[in-house]
Amino acid sequence: MRAIVLDVDDTYRVTELDEPAPGPGEVAVRVAYAGIQWGDTMVEDGIFPVPRPFVPGFEASGHIAAVGAGVDEGRIGEPVAALVPGGAFAEVVVVPAVLALAAGDVPLPVAAGFGWGTPTAYDLVNTAARVGEGESVLIHAAAGAVGTLAAQFARLAGAGRVVGVAGSPARAGYAAAFGFDQVLLRGEFPAGLGAERFDVVLDPVGGRTRRESLRVLAPHGRLVAYGSIDGGEPVLADADELLMSGRSLLTWNSNLLSRTHPERLAGSARRALGLLAGGLIRVDVTAEYDPADLGLAVGRLRAGVTHGKSVLRVAGRLGSRP
């Protein structure tokens, strides 16, 4: 098969590799589209220390081509949205069967865009923060895939007010279409909130943003940290101070959950996929790239100039075999 590898010189190349075969409990997916996500920037930057050359890509859509021992052979040919441990930028990728989710009639570009972001947003709102009826929610990185989905899930959970924070006027304008009551610019946070306090804050940024977010929590409020895009200093929280106001600092790590409790992640993903298929939420695929432009796509994501979800066209795009 042909695959895109990230080589030791930080360039992406299309190369020929042996086609992987599924082991017990696994399926092989013939990839149609692959999602582009923040993990791809972390691989490029060496934050995920993987040996190179490495086939990146953590989100895929396509059809099941083969199954391993213990997997129903009736799944062969099934269209899926797959949460992948790596290797999605290839013609075929092997994935745990439990994390290859039946996509039904969801279009394959959208199924790739579903990726890790949709179940992450679902769990941030419903599992970690447990957003309740009438509660207020503040969402950082509001124009990203997780941010736009978290706003939609918060509305479905009954949130009374949803406020976002975005990095530019264009991104703020884009985010506004996903259920936010207000979207601030990053430079306006937190002053632009005045005295407003929130029951829930969702923060993938870290650093100063996380410190200020703790300060805008209402009594009994919950801040859920699920990333550190800022890469700044660790944020220290005084447990006794939090205790006196009933506030909580929580974390969420979908990647870890996929390794420790994959069925839990799959359950959330199936529920989220059902909401997508039913038209109750939308995954907004705003850009499709060809393999030759993968470096550009990852760079744009890193620079914060994208919004919504970007996907890579894979099927029929990796060239002919020699």
Segments from the language model and where they lie:
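C-terminal hydrophobic helical "lid"/dimerization subdomain
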Residues: 1, 262-322
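N-terminal glycine-rich beta->alpha transition that marks the start or flank
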Residues: 9-11, 17-61
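NAD(P)H dinucleotide-binding glycine-rich loop of Rossmann-like/cofactor-binding domains
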Residues: 42, 79-141
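A glycine-/small-residue-rich N-terminal strand-loop-strand element
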Residues: 44, 61-85
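Mid-domain Rossmann-like dinucleotide-binding core that forms the NAD(H)/NADP(H) cofactor-binding site
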Residues: 114-186
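Short amphipathic alpha-helix with an adjacent loop that forms part of the alpha/beta core around
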Residues: 187-196
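Glycine-rich phosphate-binding loop and adjacent beta-alpha segment
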Residues: 208-278, 314-322
